[in-house]
Amino acid sequence: MASTVEGGDTALLPEFPGGPLDAYRARASFSWKELALFTEGEDMLRFKKTIFSALENDPLFARSPGADLSLEKYRELNFLRCRRIFEYDFLSVEDMFKSPLKVLTLIQCLGMYDSSLAAKYLIHSLVFGSAIYSSGSERHLTYIQKIFRMEIFGCFALTELSHGSNTKAIRTTAHYDPATEEFIIHSPDFEAAKFWVGNMGKTATHAVVFAKLYVPGDQCHGLHPFIVQIRDSKTLLPMPGVMVGDIGKKLGQNGLDNGFAMFHKVRVPRQSLLNRMGDVTPEGTYVSSFKDVRQHFGATLGSLSWSRVSIVSLAILNLKLAVAIALRFSATRRQFGPTEEEEIPVLEYPMQQWRLLPYLAAIYALDHFSKSLFLDLMELQQGLASGDRSARQAELGREIHALASASKPLASWTTQQGIQECREACGGHGYLAMNRLGVLRDDNDPNCTYEGDNNILLQQTSNYLLGLLAHQVQDGACFRSPLKSVDFLDAYPGILDQKFEVSSVADCLDSAVALAAYKWLVCYLLRETYQKLNQEKRSGSSDFEARNKCQVSHGRPLALAFVELTVVQRFHEHVHQPCVPPSLRAVLGRLSALYALWSLSRHAALLYRGGYFSGEQAGEVLESAVLALCSQLKDDAVALVDVIAPPDFILDSPIGRADGELYKNLWGAILQESKALERASWWPEFSVNKPVIGSLKSKL
């Protein structure tokens, strides 16, 4: 391993080209190669290099600077590229189970090239595929083979035109006909059309369609998933009774064809029901493998968490790209200085450090969290596949649902805010489309909305926590969960007695300080939210009204504080484990502390309101600690970016290239733009067709 770290394996981690970034790279307190190996592992680094090299050397993936593709051409190109990924077969189904994190790595690599490509591949292979795998049974395994041979192309159809977040109001129906042993899939009207479904617009042949299941006697058993063929696999023409189309151009991710579908009494075989959670006999009797409704609900929620957990990873990859661009720019862009003769890199300014370095720390913390949560989800899926119907399995589903529901908002919002900060931190050059920050901002934007509106998802998490507290108050139950994310709440009366007692900045430079504060904050917000909820109910509000009245100032911050605590806790434990190389402990500790304290600082008002903070000193120490950590990480920033940044071809930003030749790269890219030096094709409109001043002025 040592020879690899020191450059013995130059093919795996080649040296960066010399240039203006050399000075910062020389100042780093650690070896970026050693950190890359510790963070990813040699096998994963080789996997990433294989993917990136294949894309860079394949003409189908060639970049076209300045090209404005038509919507139709972009969709075609994205599909061809998605098909090529299957031809490369970077990751077999067997490998997915042997090394689950390679799934996330593949998605991140594709997303770094183009978010539309990652989304298209993800929806077909992981979201559609995992829905069948986790919700279906042996009779559906043939679909898995067809998915990875690309004999069919899939999508996940839950949302409707008039309902998205409120899944209980979904109106597509599936009535069982025992005479023919078929389900009749039907959209009662256009408002019940499946809508916003990725891959459905032009390419999907099959959909996992969620519909309300009815058995004879009009007894409804709630939402269930069905495999429904929507297009002929040979002609891509709609199947009988299916109206399917594309919803049009979006603000971003336009390589992905989002679509709609209506079903007019479409008959599908009884076996089309994905029946792991519930089934219908040939005679029309509904049977469920879960006797307890709560267990059934928890398992169902967990099986639907795939896309939300994946979105966390998709969001973080966008932040990786944006921060890599902005920090390399900041290390080479010189403006002003202590004398008129000397200009210094803008990264030397505390303001630039404060704007960007917390997002660099967020990348490391959230990336680790997304991987750990993905592995937790794999554990849940394996339990479902093995037929585990234990109470622990159901509770694991509820806990993962709560964590996924809050981590998607945290990751997507952090990324959206971070990309905007990066865009502004790069000044006017950041506004040039060729530097990619605008594209990243638009492509990340839907992460805040699809698979659940962020603010509504946070209510799922706060409801989970409130339910645990109610169970404890009413039944004396302990706070316990399979992943131990809530176990600390058992000590909440004692935690609420604690105060912030750190008096110096030096004592604050550890994520353990923020961990203690976060535990107090979650306990405080949980108690306050619970009391507020009960107060509203005693005042005559219904449960629905009471929860809505509590959400803005109580439930929302509770959910965010809880997931931030979980991220901080996991990253803190990760960087303080004994296996961390001594040469990496300091920089990883600073990243952990910076993310924790920076995140905590946004809750300062609540910490004061609840009495954990008192006096001016607490807030001042927190602010000063964040600035001190930014200053300490400033010289490591470029090396930390080198660990997370993809090759220049993938990054695709003249101002973010690894050689640091900011102006040469930008000038060259501008001169290569199509028609950059040509006069406008409409030049006669100025030179020949002069305006007759006042000719259109009203004579009245």
From Swiss-Prot:
Keywords noted in UniProt: Acetylation, FAD, Fatty acid metabolism, Flavoprotein, Lipid metabolism, Oxidoreductase, Peroxisome, Phosphoprotein
GO BP: fatty acid beta-oxidation using acyl-CoA oxidase; lipid homeostasis
Compartment(s): Peroxisome
Pathway annotation: Lipid metabolism; peroxisomal fatty acid beta-oxidation
Record-listed N-acetylalanine modification sites: A2
Cofactor(s) needed: FAD
Motif (Microbody targeting signal) on chain: 698-700
A GO MF term: fatty acid binding
Record flagged with keyword Phosphoprotein: yes
The reaction(s) this protein catalyses: a 2,3-saturated acyl-CoA + O2 = a (2E)-enoyl-CoA + H2O2; (2S)-pristanoyl-CoA + O2 = (2E)-pristenoyl-CoA + H2O2; tetracosanoyl-CoA + O2 = (2E)-tetracosenoyl-CoA + H2O2; hexadecanoyl-CoA + O2 = (2E)-hexadecenoyl-CoA + H2O2
Cited Pfam families: ACOX, ACOX_C_alpha1, Acyl-CoA_dh_M
Gene Ontology CC, one term: peroxisome
Classification via InterPro entries: ACO, ACOX_C_alpha1, Acyl-CoA_Oxase/DH_mid-dom, Acyl-CoA_Oxase/DH_mid-dom_sf, Acyl-CoA_oxidase, Acyl-CoA_oxidase_C, AcylCo_DH-like_C, AcylCoA_DH/oxidase_NM_dom_sf
Residues in coiled coil: none
Enzyme class: oxidoreductase
Domain of life: Eukaryota
Chief location of this protein within or outside the cell: other
Positions carrying Phosphothreonine: T281
EC number(s) from the headed UniProt entry: 1.3.3.6
Purpose: Oxidizes the CoA-esters of 2-methyl-branched fatty acids.
Family note: Belongs to the acyl-CoA oxidase family.
Name assigned to this protein: Peroxisomal acyl-coenzyme A oxidase 3
